[in-house]
């Protein structure tokens, strides 16, 4: 039995998210179906981070076990030929049998993309959040400082979150402006359900001048979801990287735009 790692990219608009669901189409279902056909046996995969409905990935990491002998090219080109256009395998490699794409991960990186322009873009409308009002990035970054370290993020978790603990360790949270795009990059050991989108929703209130940077600290300390802002839309969020003890994968979405 061999353990294979896949780096995959997908556009999440047409899917209920990563995880297989009985009622609608998922990225996991499409990938497992294609892999199973190439392997001529049932294949089940594990991913580094389960994305929600409408969320995208430029560097999702997946692993699966199979005793079917296939060259690496078959696991990539052969499976890609069976996958829909909005899901593709970028790379494949054999890894140690102890490797688990989820539990071996040290941290995960997400990007949230905001198109900050007076006029919306037909081209980028499905790829990022449009905000026509000017955003104060300096204040947003001041607010981000309160997010760093291991903290209780109850104020930013959804009511459907099934995690046993609200504590998460954030190593980086920063807004970067590149032309008309504003990129929120956040790195953490893991994230709660809707956590990043809830953070973005609240940080936008700071950037628009409705709240001070210190307000984020107040919301955190409240440990109450009702004290934070509304959830930012899913289509601006991208899973872009994972770090493991021996290697890492990262493809920043803004580098694909610019």
Swiss-Prot record:
Q: List GO molecular-function terms, semicolon-separated.
A: RNA binding; tRNA pseudouridine(38-40) synthase activity
Protein name from the UniProt record: tRNA pseudouridine synthase A
> Organism source for this protein?
Francisella tularensis subsp. holarctica (strain LVS)
Entry-linked Gene3D superfamilies? Pseudouridine synthase I, catalytic domain, C-terminal subdomain, Pseudouridine synthase I, catalytic domain, N-terminal subdomain
Top-rank taxon of the source lineage equals Bacteria
Q: Does the keyword tRNA processing apply?
A: yes
Per its record, the protein catalyses: uridine(38/39/40) in tRNA = pseudouridine(38/39/40) in tRNA
Task: Spell out the catalytic residues.
Answer: 52 (nucleophile)
Which PANTHER family has this protein been placed in?
PSEUDOURIDYLATE SYNTHASE, TRNA PSEUDOURIDINE SYNTHASE-LIKE 1
Return the Pfam families for the record.
PseudoU_synth_1
The task this protein performs is described as: Formation of pseudouridine at positions 38, 39 and 40 in the anticodon stem and loop of transfer RNAs.
Enumerate the NCBIfam families for this protein. Answer: hisT_truA
The EC number on file is 5.4.99.12
- Record keywords: Isomerase, tRNA processing
Q: Which EC class is this protein assigned?
A: isomerase
Q: How does it assemble?
A: Homodimer.
Q: Which GO terms describe its biological process?
A: tRNA pseudouridine synthesis
Q: Which family does it belong to?
A: Belongs to the tRNA pseudouridine synthase TruA family.
Residues annotated for substrate binding in this entry: 110
Q: Does the keyword S-adenosyl-L-methionine apply?
A: no
């Amino acid at each position: 039995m061999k353990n294979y790692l896949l780096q995959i990219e997908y556009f999440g608009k047409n899917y209920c998210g990563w995880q297989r669901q009985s009622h609608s189409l998922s990225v996991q279902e499409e990938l497992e179906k294609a892999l199973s056909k190439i392997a001529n046996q049932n294949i089940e995969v594990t991913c580094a981070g389960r994305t929600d409905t409408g969320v995208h990935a430029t560097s999702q990491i997946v692993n699966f076990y199979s005793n079917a002998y296939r060259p690496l090219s078959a696991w990539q080109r052969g499976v890609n030929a069976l996958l829909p256009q909005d899901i593709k395998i970028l790379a494949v490699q054999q890894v140690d049998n102890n490797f688990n794409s989820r539990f071996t991960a040290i941290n995960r990186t997400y990007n949230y993309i905001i198109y900050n322009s007076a006029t919306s873009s037909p081209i980028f409308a499905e790829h990022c959040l449009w905000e026509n009002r000017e955003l104060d990035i300096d204040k947003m970054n001041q607010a981000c400082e309160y997010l760093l370290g291991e903290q209780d993020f109850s104020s930013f978790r959804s009511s459907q979150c099934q995690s046993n603990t609200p504590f998460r360790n954030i190593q980086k949270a920063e807004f970067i402006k590149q032309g008309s795009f504003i990129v929120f990059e956040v790195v953490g050991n893991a994230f709660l359900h809707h956590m990043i989108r809830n953070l973005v929703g609240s940080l936008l209130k700071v950037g628009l001048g409705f709240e001070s940077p210190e307000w984020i600290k107040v919301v955190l300390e409240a440990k109450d979801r009702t004290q934070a802002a509304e959830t930012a839309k899913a289509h601006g969020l991208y899973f872009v990287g994972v770090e493991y003890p021996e290697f890492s994968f990262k493809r920043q979405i803004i580098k694909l735009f610019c």
